[in-house]
């Protein structure tokens, strides 16, 4: 996935992908049930993508134009910086978009870095199934440079970290992340978050709010 990447991603082996999947499912299982009568389903898109032949890929590629792809902000930045854009990166939004078609979804939820990919799926759903698909894009926590926090960037707080490490990582965040951190990573009511934002703006010491944020995240 080239989303939000200034350079091509490092290619992973299938074994690495499967191992990452196990880790993500393990972390997600703290919030989502993968067993029982109403369990969440975990699907590999190889279930349908592996069945596609080259004719199918060409047919799918005919649903979008190069101009549409080049309007993507990440590709615009690469072009301006004279960095390469590979064909497989062009194909990725189509492949992810086709996941929606294959599963016949009604709604897709993802981080706002996935908006282009999810809207590609919406367009494909319209053209291939004459069906509307709704997209919900959620905020992502970004560091002081505007780069989203994640595994690739090495600046995330992992659910697998010890409470001490999680606390320390949050305390290392810039003050600008305090309010977004409360909004995105805690269950505090928004009126309390807005109140803290106003207090910080009036000159209150941000450190005490950051300590409270770290406690909320760790608990």
What name fits each language-model region?
Residues 10-137:
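Divalent-metal (Mg2+/Mn2+/Ca2+)-assisted nucleotide/phosphate chemistry catalytic cores
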Residues 116, 124-219:
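Conserved nucleotide- and phosphate/pyrophosphate-binding catalytic cores
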Residues 7, 107, 111, 156, ...:
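Short, flexible active-site loop motifs that bind/organize anionic cofactors or intermediates
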């Amino acid at each position: 996935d080239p989303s939000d990447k200034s350079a091509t991603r490092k290619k992973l082996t299938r074994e690495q992908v499967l191992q990452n999947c196990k880790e993500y499912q393990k972390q997600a299982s703290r919030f989502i049930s993968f067993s029982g009568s109403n369990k969440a389903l975990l699907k590999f898109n190889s279930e349908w993508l592996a069945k596609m032949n080259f004719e199918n890929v060409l047919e799918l590629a005919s649903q979008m134009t190069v101009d549409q792809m080049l309007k993507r902000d990440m590709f615009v930045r690469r072009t301006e910086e004279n960095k390469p854009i590979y064909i497989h990166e062009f194909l990725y939004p189509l492949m992810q978009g086709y996941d929606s078609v294959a599963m016949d979804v009604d709604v897709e939820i993802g981080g706002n870095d996935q908006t282009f990919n999810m809207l590609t799926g919406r367009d494909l759903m319209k053209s291939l199934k004459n069906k509307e698909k709704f997209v919900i894009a959620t905020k992502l926590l970004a560091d002081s440079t505007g780069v989203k926090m994640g595994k690739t960037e090495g600046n995330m707080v992992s659910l697998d970290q010890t409470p001490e490490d999680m606390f320390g990582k949050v305390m290392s965040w810039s003050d600008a992340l305090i309010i977004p951190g409360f909004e995105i990573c805690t269950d505090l009511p928004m009126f309390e978050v807005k109140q803290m934002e106003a207090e910080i703006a009036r000159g209150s010491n941000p450190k005490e709010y950051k300590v409270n944020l770290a406690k909320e995240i760790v608990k």
